[in-house]
Amino acid sequence: MDTPFLIEQVYDAPIEKVWQALTDKDKMKKWYFPQLKKFEPVIGFRFEFTDDGSHYKKEWQVTRVEEGRKLAHSWTYKDYPGSSEVTFELFEEGNKTRLKLTHTGLASFPTDPHFARRRFEDGWKQIIGSNLKNYLEN
């Protein structure tokens, strides 16, 4: 059974600023993946990249956009089985914003340690709980 990974974080930033951080390529490169060459928050837009020092090419496709509220993209690896989806949802909480990230389909990836659920969990905790927080609040 594939249990989705879920993480939530509240940022001391307005929802518009968080949305821009999630959808503007130049802003995304500062907290998400610096090697990202292009991105458009448009359903069907495909993008790919490889982490520095890795031979695992990530292939993503935007699957859902609700302006200012929700962004989702598929997450696959070139030449490897499995497909997952990442969904970012934003909620206004006064002058702050709560982000809810859900990553489904992790069990569909190979049993190779690179695809271990724990790697994804640790990665998202760093990206959402630290990288994005520091980017938005400093």
Task: Give the residues covered by each predicted segment.
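Hydrophobic residues in beta-strands and at strand termini
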Residues: 7, 11, 49-51, 90
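Hydrophobic-ligand binding "helix-grip"
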Residues: 38, 53-96, 104-107
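Short, hydrophobic/aromatic-enriched beta-strand segments in well-ordered soluble domains
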Residues: 9, 101-103
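Charge-dense, helix-prone N-terminal extensions
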Residues: 4, 16, 47-48, 57-61, ...
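A conserved amphipathic terminal alpha-helix motif
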Residues: 105-138
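Short coil-to-beta transition motif at edge beta-strands of beta-rich domains
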Residues: 41-46
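Hydrophobic ligand-binding cavity/cleft-lining segments
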Residues: 1-38
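Hydrophobic pocket/interface hotspot
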Residues: 18, 28, 47, 62, ...
